[in-house]
């Protein structure tokens, strides 16, 4: 069940609350066990959601989940304040350092990484044209909610808090979270970067990974030496429900502490490459073909695949020749056929090995590499285990045999023009020879 908290101390929250009640069929109920200002009194229910109203600002509502009956996810409908113009934003709550705005020092609420990703997608669908959308770092209370939670905010000033379209967009985005699982196995804790977490926002928009707690640069400054902040760093993973981190910037001391605590630092490349690919398959591919961070790339067939595979080396001469003709086409060929393939030069050059779902895919990939040669050779054919390429080219030896020595006439002939030698015409066809290259595989 989705729990929704509205605060009477927040005009944007009240506005969003009114929009929520207008956008769904709610039934009105009375809770006489709790004080009206603590979520009791009149409250509202609709399909898979319940809305309660509190007097205090959200940031001071520790334990808010206790007002609801076993919520899976709790959303604080809130204003956002800042110099950021029209903005819809969301984030997990708690404090990496001192609790200046609710919650406790070094205390983090249970994050909802999958719900954060879902509401970020909903923002894109529902936001008015003049609004930006995004996420923020973890930066205020409450830090003890009682279930997975996040703030969903309308900002960034009075004009937006009173904006009907903006409030409706937030309300629709909140309602879209009904039935959404709060957590996902594919989650990272974020460390570093600015308050509005552009790198971690990119993770949500460009990959299928979720983002839990985010400690921005200023939070890490408050923490000081990461060796002295091991407890709160560990809490960030526990409260995010993950063992993985993404670090923005060069922070070797922090990464050392993360790894010493038993967690793993991933790269953004890893998150992008593994999108849609079962992590169990990723692990096996890296074991056989090398790490993604060392150049392994995952092809289209890896999406959703978790079966067996074979590993093969590509024929060196054919691969070198094809890369020399069009390395982009070679990458595209490998991407279309292979589960995974090795690369060099920052991922731009396919070099092998390749992992294939079936042994027959090896020949398919060779055929694709042979097709790349078509732009350089006059004909390319495959016989048994050999790619045979033919190309008609100017032969200097034939030109000299025809009496054309080095000089202007030689240059004209090599460029495709006929020349006269002692009253005889020598044509380009006279001095061209078909050359053959054979590539074994």
Curated annotation (Swiss-Prot):
<dbReference type="InterPro" id="IPR007508">
    <property type="entry name" value="DtdA"/>
</dbReference>
<dbReference type="Pfam" id="PF04414">
    <property type="entry name" value="tRNA_deacylase"/>
</dbReference>
<keyword id="KW-0479">Metal-binding</keyword>
<keyword id="KW-0862">Zinc</keyword>
<comment type="function">
    <text>D-aminoacyl-tRNA deacylase with broad substrate specificity. By recycling D-aminoacyl-tRNA to D-amino acids and free tRNA molecules, this enzyme counteracts the toxicity associated with the formation of D-aminoacyl-tRNA entities in vivo.</text>
</comment>
<keyword id="KW-0378">Hydrolase</keyword>
<dbReference type="GO" id="GO:0008270">
    <property type="term" value="F:zinc ion binding"/>
</dbReference>
<dbReference type="InterPro" id="IPR018033">
    <property type="entry name" value="Deacylase_DtdA_archaea"/>
</dbReference>
<dbReference type="GO" id="GO:0051499">
    <property type="term" value="F:D-aminoacyl-tRNA deacylase activity"/>
</dbReference>
<dbReference type="GO" id="GO:0019478">
    <property type="term" value="P:D-amino acid catabolic process"/>
</dbReference>
<comment type="subunit">
    <text>Monomer.</text>
</comment>
<comment type="similarity">
    <text>Belongs to the DtdA deacylase family.</text>
</comment>
<protein>
    <recommendedName>
        <fullName>D-aminoacyl-tRNA deacylase</fullName>
        <ecNumber>3.1.1.96</ecNumber>
    </recommendedName>
</protein>
């Amino acid at each position: 069940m989705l729990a929704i908290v509205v605060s009477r101390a927040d005009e944007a929250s009240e506005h969003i609350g009114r929009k929520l009640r207008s956008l769904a069929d709610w039934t009105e109920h009375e809770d006489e066990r709790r004080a009206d200002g603590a979520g009791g009194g009149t409250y509202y229910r609709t399909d898979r959601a319940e809305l309660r109203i509190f007097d205090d600002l959200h940031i001071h509502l520790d334990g808010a989940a206790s007002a609801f009956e076993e919520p899976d996810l709790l959303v604080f409908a809130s204003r956002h304040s800042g110099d950021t113009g029209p903005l819809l934003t969301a984030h997990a709550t708690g404090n990496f350092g001192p609790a200046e705005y609710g919650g406790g020092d070094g205390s983090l609420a249970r994050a909802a990484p999958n719900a954060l990703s879902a509401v970020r997608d909903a923002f894109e669908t529902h936001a008015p044209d003049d609004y930006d959308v995004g996420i923020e770092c973890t930066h205020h209370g409450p830090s003890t909610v009682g279930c997975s939670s996040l703030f969903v905010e309308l900002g960034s000033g009075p004009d937006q808090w009173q904006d009907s379209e903006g409030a409706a967009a937030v309300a629709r985005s909140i309602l879209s979270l009904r039935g959404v699982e709060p957590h996902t196995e594919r989650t990272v804790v974020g460390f570093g970067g600015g308050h509005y977490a552009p790198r971690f926002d990119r993770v949500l928009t460009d990959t299928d990974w979720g983002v839990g707690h985010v400690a921005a640069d200023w939070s890490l400054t408050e923490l000081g030496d990461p060796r002295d902040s091991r407890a709160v760093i560990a809490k960030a993973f526990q409260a995010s429900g993950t063992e993985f981190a993404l670090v923005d910037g060069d922070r070797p001391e922090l990464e050392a502490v993360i790894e010493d605590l038993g967690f793993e630092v991933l790269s953004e490349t890893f998150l992008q490459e593994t999108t849609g690919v079962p992590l169990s398959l990723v692990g096996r591919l890296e074991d056989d073909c090398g790490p993604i961070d060392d150049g392994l790339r995952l092809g289209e067939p890896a999406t959703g695949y978790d079966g067996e595979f074979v590993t093969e080396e590509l024929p060196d001469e054919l691969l070198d020749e094809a890369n020399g003709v069009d390395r982009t086409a070679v990458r595209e060929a490998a991407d279309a056929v292979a589960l995974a393939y090795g690369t060099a030069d920052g991922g731009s050059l396919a070099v092998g090995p390749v992992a294939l779902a079936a042994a027959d895919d090896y020949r398919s990939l060779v055929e694709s590499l042979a097709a790349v040669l078509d732009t350089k050779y006059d004909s390319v054919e495959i016989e048994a285990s050999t790619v045979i390429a033919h190309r008609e080219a100017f032969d200097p030896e034939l030109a000299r045999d025809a009496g054309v020595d080095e000089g202007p006439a030689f240059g004209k002939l090599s460029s495709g023009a006929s020349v006269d030698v002692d009253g005889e015409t020598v044509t380009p066809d006279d001095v061209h020879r078909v050359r053959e290259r054979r590539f074994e595989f």
